[in-house]
Amino acid sequence: MPDRYAVMGNPIAHSKSPQIHTAFAQQTGQALTYTGLQVEAGKLAEAITAFQQQEGKGLNITIPLKAEAWRLVDQCSPQAQRAKAVNTILLEKNGALLGDNTDGVGLVRDLINNHGGRITGQQVLLLGAGGAASGVIEALLKEHPSHLIIVNRTPAKAIELAARFSPFGAITGGGYELLENNSFHLIINATASSLQGELPPLPRGILRSGGWVYDMMYGNEPTIFMKWGQTHGAARSLDGLGMLVEQAAEAFFIWRKVRPKSAPIIAQLRREMDIKNPAMPL
């Protein structure tokens, strides 16, 4: 019997994780199945118990369940503990749940390895202070940007995140007023605004000459945030598809101790992207 894996979230129909992990399994010669399971907020513990009873081996967790997963696991990696968000669970034979967060690794690998980007010494702006943001802050700071600024419509959330991650580097959090008279080499959108076709309130001149923009959402067409970057002189306007594949590759390694090649899967997904879904979350 192949080992069983799944991704849990709501909504889940859009998820490309089953396709990605099936491709990884074929590429590496691993015998496993991977499915998408819709789970409502507040029902994750029940869903995980049912999956364990079916001898499941591991789970990915997507929106809106990452914080709930963090509260449920028996043990988690230091980065997941600090992020207070879990996107990968290893189900031990004794029933223990081991949690991790691979989002930060996925973002940094996509930016640096796949696109030749640079974080070290750069002024970096992170938009949003939810689970998508908290999962990537530590990985960004470990690349030693000159300064990381987090802004959020509710400033207190960004301030709390900055305080939590201050041991890892120069970081400031607050409201969008922090952006006045400031400019950045790299702007990362960790909000869900692209899903609604909306833009965060960014002032003119916020992107430095030659700067990059990165939207954690992805789609067949450029997201509205990527288009904003293109019209404001971005040297590169990138979406989060590569991050999705890279965080999945890290999760696959945690489960199977085999590291798949991500580039062929990213290229395959680009070819197959459904035009009916212009923006999708990780």
Swiss-Prot record:
EC numbers for this chain: 1.1.1.25
Catalytic residues, chain numbering: K66
InterPro entries reported for this sequence: Aminoacid_DH-like_N_sf (IPR046346), NAD(P)-bd_dom_sf (IPR036291), SDH_C (IPR041121), Shikimate_DH (IPR011342), Shikimate_DH-bd_N (IPR013708), Shikimate_DH_fam (IPR022893), Shikm_DH/Glu-tRNA_Rdtase (IPR006151)
Enzyme class: oxidoreductase
A single cellular component GO annotation: cytosol
Record-listed shikimate binding positions: S15, K16, S17, T62, N87, D103, Y218
Involved pathway(s): Metabolic intermediate biosynthesis; chorismate biosynthesis; chorismate from D-erythrose 4-phosphate and phosphoenolpyruvate: step 4/7
Subunit: Homodimer.
Stated name of the protein: Shikimate dehydrogenase (NADP(+))
